[in-house]
Every structure is written in structure tokens, then in C-alpha cells.
Amino acid sequence: MLETDSKASKVGSKPKQALLIAGILFIAVNLRPALASVGPLVSTIRESTGLSNSMLGLLTALPLLAFGVVSMLTPLFTKRFGMAATLAGALLLITIGILTRSIDLVSTLYIGTILSGIGIAFGNVLLPSLVKRNFSSNSGLITSLYSSIMAVGAATAAGISVPLAQNEAFGWRGALAVWAILSLAAFFIWLPQVWRIKKAKKHRNFMKAMKNLASSKLAWKVAIFMGLQSFAFYVILAWVPDILQSRGYNASYSGWMLSLSQGTGSFRLVTYSFVGR
């Protein structure tokens, strides 16, 4: 049975542990589809809306801007609302954002992208902390599980976005909107944790913590490394399908190639398991 940190909220029985893990995995699977579903449809969106490459570049960059801003402000939200409630709010933001960008307006395409990007940013920041707090003795296993689920979510979204968009019942807006079903389901699965996971009692001063980080050489090195890694990842996520299509491959094939590149990330579960031994 997985053991939880005694200083964290007590998960208790196996069913409650299983529900918490399920909630974590459902949050994880929602942190990539809203992003991965766009890349294969860039050409379709361009043809439908008349947006230029620079405007489409802005569309794919908005979530990254949200990540940078929200990541720094997340401690303020967890201090006020607690980690579980903040994650619940993040899932609602993802859902609202996905639905908003499916409205037949160019402006809502950008507004919805920003909203979903903010929600994803909260999830990116809080999931590792949540796992470390509640499963300190099994954090490697849980981390590998949710990391693999994230890769599966990205691969699935990248692969089926074009087939959905080519279906007259969906279109490209419907292909983007369909992921709101998954994020809304995750919200209801996670909701019980809002009452079960207690807020941490001790908090460091936000400004003092930021000053300490700003003066840390190690923090800057890690930030630069992770920033470059994320830059490469999201460029691939957003533009590889369009590049392949410009080389003569059809949209469906390009989407599945992106899906393959993301799906290989699920093998990290096996890698982490061996490393853990």
C-alpha cells in the first residue's frame, strides 16, 4: 500500500488513496491535449480564419507566456485557497478555455487559449508538489505514472485531432472543443479532494522566497535548462505537423507523426521503474 507523508493530509484507506491517485492521473492527462490538439490543425485554422503565420505563432505562444507568469504567482493562490482547491479551479479554467476557443470568433480563439494555458500552468506547477507532499515514499512511482499519462494525453490529442476535424459533425472547432469533456470529468473526479486535502499551515513569505530564488545561481541554472527544454518541446508540439504538411505529407499523417513522437514519452514509466531499483 502506498504510504503518505505524515505531515500532509491523511489519505487514509486504500479507496481514498486510489481516488487521490485517480484524481492526479486525470489532472495529468488534461495538461497536454489542449496544446497538442492545435499543432495538427494549424493549416486548417489558417485556411478557415485567414490568420497569418505570425498570428498563429502568437496563438501557440500564449500558453507559454501564461506558464511563465502563473508559475511565479501560484504560491499566492495555494496560500489563499489551498493546493486542492487551486487544482480544481485550474481544471475549470482548462474546461472554460477549451470551450471558449471553440466559439466561432477569432478573438475567443485567443481568449480561450489564454484561459486554458493558465489552468495548465497551475497543474504543471502543483502536481509535483502534490505528489511529494502526499506520497513522499512513492513519489518516483507516482511521478512516472502521471508523466506517462501526460504523454499518452498528448499523443492521443495529436493523433485524433485531424480525423475529428475532418468529420462534418465536429469540424476543427469541435475537434478542439471535445477535450472539455475530459477536463470536466477530471474536475468532478478531483472535487472530493478539495475537502480531504487540508491546507498547509505554514507559509513562507512570498517576496522573501522570490528574492531567495533570484539570488540563487542554482535556481537560475535550473530555470534556464528547463526553459530551453520546454521551448524545444512546445515548438515541436506546435509546428512539426505544419512543417510536415509543407513537405507534402497530408494532415492526418502529420498528426500521427506528432502523436508517435509524444507517445514515446510513455516509456519513461519503464525507465523510472528501472532507475528506482
Range-by-range predicted roles:
Residues 36, 64-72, 154-155, 262-270:
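Residue-level signature of mid-helix packing/kink "hotspots" within the transmembrane helices
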Residues 38-39, 217-259, 263:
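Extracytoplasmic gate region of multi-pass secondary transporters
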Residues 42-43, 74, 153-166, 241, ...:
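Small-residue (Gly/Pro/Ala) motifs that create kinks and tight helix-helix packing interfaces
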Residues 106, 137-138, 145-195:
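Helix-loop-helix hairpin linking two adjacent transmembrane segments in secondary transporters
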Residues 113-148:
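Cytoplasmic helix-loop-helix junction between adjacent transmembrane helices
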